[in-house]
Swiss-Prot record:
Organism: Mus musculus
Any one Gene Ontology molecular-function term assigned to this protein's record: growth factor activity
UniProt protein name: Neurotrophin-3
Annotated PANTHER family: NERVE GROWTH FACTOR NGF -RELATED (PTHR11589), NEUROTROPHIN-3 (PTHR11589:SF4)
Signal peptide: 1-18
GO biological process terms, semicolon-separated: axon guidance; brain development; central nervous system neuron development; enteric nervous system development; epidermis development; generation of neurons; glial cell fate determination; mechanoreceptor differentiation
Propeptide segments, given as residue ranges: 19-139
Tissue: Brain and peripheral tissues.
Segments of this protein annotated with the region Disordered: 60-85
Name of the encoding gene: Ntf3
Keyword Transmembrane attributed: no
């Protein structure tokens, strides 16, 4: 198409020059050589553009094809921080430093004292060691009696040694590992829980609440801690589970009271 355009354009240019010039005209040889050069230039341009396209296609064909990520098939376990039941090892125990909670303890013996952060709570110890009250707890009890302060609800704290199941942060029922085999002696998992002694410490509900305008009741509250658990007896790992951690007073306004 471009060659035809060049020929028509040159013929038109020659006609104009023939009309405007007297006896002189463009030599026939020079005109033919000009046409030949234009045709050669156009052919060379087309050839170069075709070569560039071929080089680009060859380069793309040599590149490795990117594979799409394979979706796990149904029932296939994806790689995660959880391990199969048969592969539970000391690596999970090393992770306790990262997932450590003061209310969760891995030990080869039953704990006799509350965690350091909860020494000032009303701890219910093991009956065997109930008489071994530490001087620190005795001093705190005496100091508390002189302050004239009372709790709205009465709570008690203790180490739970037989926890077998719990609800995780997704709302799923999971199995709590009671014993973990490591090396020479297995270790057990203990949970320091706090709950209400009774729903109504006084006749009408919580202590110190105006019962003319309010209904009150002591309720155990839960929070999340990290614990070694398994789901469907397959994958073992550290999960967030709910345990009893406090006793609070729940209030509701009495109907007809303002």
């Amino acid at each position: 198409m471009s060659i035809l355009f060049y020929v028509i354009f040159l013929a038109y240019l020659r006609g104009i020059q023939g009309n405007s010039m007297d006896q002189r005209s463009l030599p026939e040889d020079s005109l033919n050589s000009l046409i030949i050069k234009l045709i050669q230039a156009d052919i060379l341009k087309n050839k170069l553009s075709k070569q560039m396209v071929d080089v680009k296609e060859n380069y793309q064909s040599t590149l490795p094809k990117a594979e799409a990520p394979r979706e796990p098939e149904q029932g296939e376990a994806t790689r995660s921080e959880f391990q199969p039941m048969i592969a539970t090892d000391t690596e999970l125990l090393r992770q306790q430093r990262r997932y450590n909670s003061p209310r969760v303890l891995l030990s080869d013996s039953t704990p006799l004292e509350p965690p350091p952060l909860y020494l000032m709570e009303d701890y219910v110890g093991n009956p065997v060691v109930a008489n071994r009250t530490s001087p620190r707890r005795k001093r705190y009890a005496e100091h508390k009696s002189h302050r004239g302060e009372y709790s709205v609800c009465d709570s008690e704290s203790l180490w739970v040694t037989d926890k077998s199941s719990a609800i995780d942060i997704r709302g799923h029922q999971v199995t709590v590992l009671g014993e973990i085999k490591t090396g020479n002696s297995p270790v057990k998992q203990y949970f320091y829980e706090t709950r209400c002694k009774e729903a109504r410490p006084v006749k009408n509900g919580c202590r110190g609440i105006d019962d003319k305008h309010w209904n009150s009741q002591c309720k155990t509250s839960q929070t999340y801690v990290r614990a070694l658990t398994s789901e469907n007896n397959k994958l073992v790992g550290w999960r967030w589970i709910r345990i009893d951690t406090s006793c609070v007073c729940a209030l509701s306004r009495k109907i007809g009271r303002t």
